[in-house]
Amino acid sequence: MTVIYPSPIFGPVHSRRLGVSLGINLLPEDGKVCTFDCIYCECGFNSDHRPKKPLPTREEVRAALEARLQDMQKNGPVPDVLTFAGNGEPTAHPHFPEIIEDTLALRDKYFPKAKVSVLSNSTFIHRPAVFEALNKVDNNILKLDTADEAYIRKLDRPAGHYSVRGIIGGMKAFKGNCIIQTMFLKGGFGDKDMDNTSDKYVLPWLEAVKEISPRQVMIYTIDRETPDHDLQKATHEELDRIAALVREAGM
């Protein structure tokens, strides 16, 4: 089954990439709010989970986070990271920049060694306040599943006006202070072949990554239930080949 996360705080969970991660969900607890509608999303399709409840307020997020950090300070476990993730796109919250300020202050107070991470699909990085907030966190993790304009509309299915080239330009503005995260998979969606592990997709993506020049690249494949059941994991060999190309490019 796909999953909808509690709000505004969930976990901690053990993350493959980040360690002991306390989740911060700025979206409603009863549904999904996202500018993407990815066919592999562990939260399901947007249409499956239309929320009826409001977004948590800045004050609710701050109070819930402080209470959880106090409990973890007393009873454990020690978090490696505080991660903005959950039921959709965290930067869509109207008070995302202020919530980042609150989170950094609480992190410094209770667990100064913990990192603050944001998992974002990059659709709001053109907003100056969002850009500045992402520049302040330890791990600014930005999604770039492809450099192909047609393929992204089959895989990530962005809402409204969306330009891959525009997003790549926005990512370049971070001047290396970002981590690129990319999903590689195979299988189909309806009558569409969704395999993005071939050079047709990998090489243009690699050129885009070189342009962005991030400090790190995360490549991964499906690990949890997906709303479309015809999707398949990329193999270890395929991921290793792509990783080798990234390393050869100096990242």
Model features per residue range: what roles?
Residues 228-251:
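Short acidic, glycine/proline-enriched helix-loop-strand junctions
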Residues 92-232:
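Conserved AdoMet/S-adenosylmethionine-binding subsite of the radical SAM
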Residues 82-87:
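Short glycine-rich or small-residue beta-strand-to-loop segments that form or flank ligand, phosphate
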